[in-house]
Design a protein with these regions (language model features):
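Short helix-boundary/capping micro-motifs
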Residues: 10-25
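A short LG(V/I)-centered, amphipathic sequence patch enriched
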Residues: 39-56
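Alpha-helical linker/hinge and terminal dimerization helices associated
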Residues: 41-42, 63-78
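Residues within the DNA-recognition helix of helix-turn-helix
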Residues: 27, 34-37
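Hydrophobic two-helix hairpin corresponding to the core of helix-turn-helix DNA-binding domains
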Residues: 8, 20-21, 57-60
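Base-recognition residues in the alpha-helical recognition helix of bacterial helix-turn-helix
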Residues: 6, 18, 32-34, 48
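Alpha-helical residues within the helix-turn-helix
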Residues: 22, 33, 40
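The N-cap/first-turn positions of alpha helices
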Residues: 1-7, 28, 60
C-alpha cells in the first residue's frame, strides 16, 4: 500500500487527482483525502486545484523535494 507521500507525488507527477487515482487503482476521493491529510499534517496548502488539473503552490514547491525524499526512503525500506 502506498503512503500519502507517494500518493501526493503521483498527483504532482500526473498533474491530476483523477489520473493519479487511475494509475494507483484508487478512487479519486481516496486520493484527494490523502492529499488533504498531508496538507493538514504540514499545515499548508500544497496544491492549487483547478479545472484543468493541479499545480504546486509556493509552499508545495518548497515541500515537494522533502516529500519525495520521504517517499523514496519508504520505498527503499520495503
Amino acid at each position: 500500500m502506498i503512503s500519502r507521500y507517494g500518493i501526493f507525488c503521483r498527483v504532482v507527477e500526473q498533474g491530476s487527482f483523477t489520473r493519479a487515482a487511475e494509475e494507483l487503482g484508487y478512487s479519486q476521493s481516496a486520493v484527494s483525502q490523502n492529499v488533504r491529510a498531508l496538507e493538514q499534517e504540514t499545515g499548508v496548502t500544497l496544491l492549487s486545484r483547478r479545472k484543468d488539473g493541479v499545480q504546486l503552490t509556493q509552499d508545495g514547491q518548497e515541500f515537494y523535494p522533502y516529500i519525495q525524499s520521504i517517499f523514496q526512503a519508504e520505498q527503499a525500506l520495503e
